[in-house]
Amino acid sequence: MAQIPPSLQDMVNRFNQAQAQLQSVLLRKQQYEAELKEVDKAISEIEKLSPDAKIFKNVGNFLVPQTRDAALQELKERKELLELHVKTLSRQETMLREQLDKLRDEINKELARLKGGEAAKGGG
Amino acid sequence: MSRQDVRQEIQRLIEEYQLVGELLTNLQAQHATVSELLEELTTALDGVRLLKGGAGERLVHIGAGLFVKGVFETKEVLTPLGAGYHAFLDLDNAERVLQERIEEYSRLKTSLEENIGKLAERAEQIRQVLERLGIR
């Protein structure tokens, strides 16, 4: 079997690296989105409660009492942070997808060029 | 198709078969977890509905088939709202929260079952092709 040229090997390595990065980004994004959904659910439930409702927050093995306003403020801050994470990861995802498309094109061009060269050799 | 092409195709099919197998194992584990959660939620919902029956003596399971007599006059239950927060909700609202969660997990379970079915079908297709090619 013909030896893969170093330039092509380098492109393939970069492609695999970008693919692994994309997978990692997608996994993290999925985790943040799931957490965001959970936070949204908690916010909507707490908003239905009366201002003097007895609310408790999980802290390790303890349930610590908290006011409705404090709980809502904390959850809304957490929501903002999660949305920021998701936004950042979405940007990274777009960049990596573009990078992969570009590398895929380059690899295909290089393969076509190599095949063309081999055909010319065979014909000669 | 040259012999080398056939070899490459067989290699590709074997790799796909392994990947599908891994995905199936993963989804089946998720399905088991979701089923367990659903069972737990349904038990909790039954408990809340029992409490809605009004005050009175109840037999409460404390594990290993042991029950104790208890008198309940509860109007509220401490209910998980998500994201690590709990609140005392009246029995109607506690029932609603549990019901919503049950519906959510039921949808997830159905979706997992559909995906497991599709993957199992694909695995069987590959297995048959490989068998025809003399690979077991």
UniProtKB/Swiss-Prot annotation, chain A:
Keywords: Chaperone, Cytoplasm. The keyword Lipid biosynthesis does not apply. The keyword Cytoplasm applies. It is found in: Cytoplasm. It comes from the Archaea. InterPro entries: PFD_beta-like, PfdB, Prefoldin. GO terms for cellular component: cytoplasm; prefoldin complex. Its main location: cytoplasm. GO terms for biological process: chaperone-mediated protein complex assembly; protein folding. One of its GO terms (molecular function) is protein-folding chaperone binding. Molecular chaperone capable of stabilizing a range of proteins. Seems to fulfill an ATP-independent, HSP70-like function in archaeal de novo protein folding. Heterohexamer of two alpha and four beta subunits. Belongs to the prefoldin subunit beta family. This is Prefoldin subunit beta. It comes from Pyrobaculum arsenaticum (strain DSM 13514 / JCM 11321 / PZ6). The gene is pfdB.
UniProtKB/Swiss-Prot annotation, chain B:
GO terms for biological process: protein folding. Gene3D superfamilies: 1.10.287.370. CDD domains: Prefoldin_alpha_GimC (cd23160). GO terms for cellular component: cytoplasm; prefoldin complex. It is found in: Cytoplasm. Keywords: Chaperone, Cytoplasm. Its main location: cytoplasm. One of its GO terms (molecular function) is unfolded protein binding. Molecular chaperone capable of stabilizing a range of proteins. Seems to fulfill an ATP-independent, HSP70-like function in archaeal de novo protein folding. Heterohexamer of two alpha and four beta subunits. Belongs to the prefoldin subunit alpha family. This is Prefoldin subunit alpha. It comes from Pyrobaculum arsenaticum (strain DSM 13514 / JCM 11321 / PZ6). The lineage of its organism: Archaea, Thermoproteota, Thermoprotei, Thermoproteales, Thermoproteaceae. The gene is pfdA.
